[in-house]
Amino acid sequence: MHRYRTLLFVLLTACMCNAVFAAIELGQVAPNIEGALLDGKPFSLQAHKGKVVLVNFWASWCEPCREEMPIIEAYLKKNKSKGFEVLAITMDKPLDIEQAQKIMQKYSFLSADKKQINYSGYGRIWRIPSTFIIDKQGILRKNGLTGDPTVDTKLLEEIVTPLLSGH
């Protein structure tokens, strides 16, 4: 009986993992994200159609997250006029939100707290940083739950730049 219970647990776990990853696929319409930004303004990913949007899940205690932010900011400043936007969603606990807000003051990203915004269509965010890139038509072009989680200039130039130029 114990052997069957263990097998059932393994199968159910595998199915749940597949459901999380199957929830969002490259080349498909990206699920909407909507709610309130840290500044209180409303946000809806659907309202940003026509722009390339980088959605970055991060936390104030995450060193790789903080290291990639200046790179993303520099790219945003260079390409905002071409239709590039960044939404940074902090995964911090409520006690750390003040620290996250302090960090966000250095950047021109749209920023939100995970408790104030609905991103359920992206499945369980199990690692940070996790970065998703959505093209001007609302199609997912980078899935932050797979591959290398790091955002650097090379990735931005390879994925985002062609999307901005329409190629």
Which residue ranges define each predicted feature?
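N-terminal secretory signal peptides that target proteins for export/translocation
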Residues: 1-3
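Thiol/disulfide oxidoreductase modules built on the thioredoxin-like
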Residues: 101-109, 114-159
